[in-house]
Amino acid sequence: MLNIGLSGSTGKMGGTILERIDKFKDCKIAAKFNSTNNLDDLDNFCKNSDVIIDFSTPEILEKLINYALKHNTKLVIGTTGLQPQHFKLLEKAAQTLPVLYSANMSIGANLLSYLAKEVTKILDDYDVEILETHHRNKKDSPSGTAVMLAETIASKKGLNITFNRGNRLRSEKEIGISSLRGGNVHGIHEISFLGDDEIITLKHEALNKNSFSIGAIKAAIWLQDKPSALYSMQDIYKI
């Protein structure tokens, strides 16, 4: 039985994971950590977990990694809003532990990323723009998924990513990300390839948080016997 530690257990994603975990017979939630805990509680939290699923805040990541290294606890990181220094911490930890990071753990969003990469190879001379829509209370903008998609495309086309074009004209070598916030939208991501004569749009819409939570649990199960490295959901789905 795989003992999973759930960081961010009282958040929306944490709640959904707790609702879905019984669907999986080979794992259980053995430890929980949330905003009511002291950071030093991460010590026992990591000690009692084989793999941690983290949907908390960037502020605790360094402490979480330190205790995970102490107890050789594997990490599945789904927290968004991470900055460059956080990714450096993940890369360093992955030299010792198996670490999986993804801004979006649903199979649909990762398939969208794969399709965008393939379309980019064919539509090399098309302009590319990304529009992401989320609920009114989402803190980070643009979404981590939108950044992931943009980075995937930009790496293939040699483009710069812009989040706020303002009043300036679109430059030839850029991919833009625009954000909408409102209602109770779980997440919509649209990638438009705009040519002179036609537009091709790829779209993924999450109808609820179930696909994210199922993906996170599958990631924890998959990671349990992997060697030290930094993984993504695309390693699981082999795309």
UniProtKB/Swiss-Prot annotation:
Assigned EC number: 1.17.1.8
Entries under PROSITE patterns matching the protein: DAPB
Enzyme class (EC, first level): oxidoreductase
GO MF annotation: an example: 4-hydroxy-tetrahydrodipicolinate reductase
Principal subcellular localisation of the protein: cytoplasm
Catalytic activity: (S)-2,3,4,5-tetrahydrodipicolinate + NAD(+) + H2O = (2S,4S)-4-hydroxy-2,3,4,5-tetrahydrodipicolinate + NADH + H(+); (S)-2,3,4,5-tetrahydrodipicolinate + NADP(+) + H2O = (2S,4S)-4-hydroxy-2,3,4,5-tetrahydrodipicolinate + NADPH + H(+)
Alphabetized HAMAP family for the sequence: DapB
Family of this protein: Belongs to the DapB family.
Residues reported in the UniProt entry to bind NAD(+): 8-13, 78-80, 102-105
Localization in the cell: Cytoplasm
Positions annotated to bind (S)-2,3,4,5-tetrahydrodipicolinate: 135, 144-145
Alphabetically ordered keywords of this record: Amino-acid biosynthesis, Cytoplasm, Diaminopimelate biosynthesis, Lysine biosynthesis, NAD, NADP, Oxidoreductase
Active site: 134 (proton donor/acceptor), 138 (proton donor)
One GO BP: diaminopimelate biosynthetic process
Signal peptide: none
Function: Catalyzes the conversion of 4-hydroxy-tetrahydrodipicolinate (HTPA) to tetrahydrodipicolinate.
Name of this protein: 4-hydroxy-tetrahydrodipicolinate reductase
Pathway(s) this gene product operates in, as recorded in its UniProt entry: Amino-acid biosynthesis; L-lysine biosynthesis via DAP pathway; (S)-tetrahydrodipicolinate from L-aspartate: step 4/4
Assigned GO CC terms: cytosol
Species assigned in the record: Rickettsia africae (strain ESF-5)
